């Protein structure tokens, strides 16, 4: 079991290590691409290791490159993972057990979908259908699969996190993944998790469901 740390400063993350270790809880620690090579970040990961807190890196690209990992930025993702592995191998580099791939529509596409859902829900389906490009998707998935294999050969756990809607696809079908630009199936992950955001569901229903929603 792990918690996620995205917008916390290093001191706040470090302050939580004692409680996390006592509960046997790991942390998925966000790594903005601009912090690759940051000595302070590497030091934080070593402190987690000394505290007995399992740590996975959660890489995030710049907003201009999509922020989250997906179909449109597999080249940037490949380069980011190569830099991460090189940094890990150097003296004073970070210590981590795995890498979590946050597979979501890229930032610009996510914003377009959000605007449609709020202002013109009748256009949302057309936007999704326009994004279905099987050849481009297949090439992106193959590229991401190679990146994942590179990590695994280096002894790093490759963990995918994505939308549960992909579970509604028929076996062998990737249309929903393609529509959302989130290649997940057909890649040799060590582990796959599915995210459920409470806030938008509460906004739609007017009700806060709590942990039971995630369990469902």
Residue ranges and their predicted role:
Residues 1-13, 28-41, 63-75, 108, ...:
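Acidic-and-aromatic substrate-binding clefts and catalytic sites of carbohydrate-active enzymes
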Residues 6-36, 91-99, 187-192:
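Catalytic domains of carbohydrate-active enzymes, especially glycoside hydrolases
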Residues 28, 84-134:
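Active-site groove signature of glycoside hydrolases
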Residues 134-159, 179-183, 187-216:
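Glycoside hydrolase catalytic-domain groove-lining segments
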Residues 71-103, 175-188:
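An active-site-proximal structural segment forming one wall of the substrate-binding cleft
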Residues 2, 24-28, 52-58, 96-100, ...:
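Structural preference for beta-strand elements that scaffold enzyme active sites
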Residues 1-6, 56-58, 130-177:
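Aromatic-lined carbohydrate-recognition surfaces of secreted/lumenal glycan-active proteins
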Residues 40-49, 54-91:
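Active-site-adjacent "subsite" loops/lids of carbohydrate-active enzymes
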């Amino acid at each position: 079991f792990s918690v996620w740390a995205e917008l916390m400063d290093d001191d706040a993350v470090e302050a939580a290590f004692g409680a996390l270790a006592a509960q046997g809880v790991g942390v998925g620690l966000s790594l903005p691409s601009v912090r690759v090579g940051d000595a302070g970040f590497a030091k934080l990961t070593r402190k987690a290791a000394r505290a007995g807190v399992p740590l996975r890196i959660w890489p995030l690209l710049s907003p201009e490159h999509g922020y989250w990992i997906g179909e449109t930025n597999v080249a940037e993702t490949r380069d980011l993972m190569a830099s991460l592995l090189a940094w890990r191998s150097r003296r004073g580099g970070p210590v981590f057990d795995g890498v979590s791939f946050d597979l979501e529509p890229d930032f610009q596409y996510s914003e377009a979908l959000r605007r449609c859902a709020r202002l013109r829900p009748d256009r949302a389906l057309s936007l999704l259908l326009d994004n279905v490009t099987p050849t481009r998707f297949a090439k992106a998935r193959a590229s991401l699969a190679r990146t994942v294999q590179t990590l695994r050969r280096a002894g790093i756990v490759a963990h995918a996190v994505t939308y549960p809607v992909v579970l509604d696809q028929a076996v062998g079908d990737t249309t929903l993944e393609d529509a959302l630009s989130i290649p997940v199936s057909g890649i040799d992950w060590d582990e796959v998790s599915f995210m459920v955001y409470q806030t938008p569901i509460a906004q739609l229903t007017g009700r806060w469901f709590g942990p039971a929603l995630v369990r469902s």
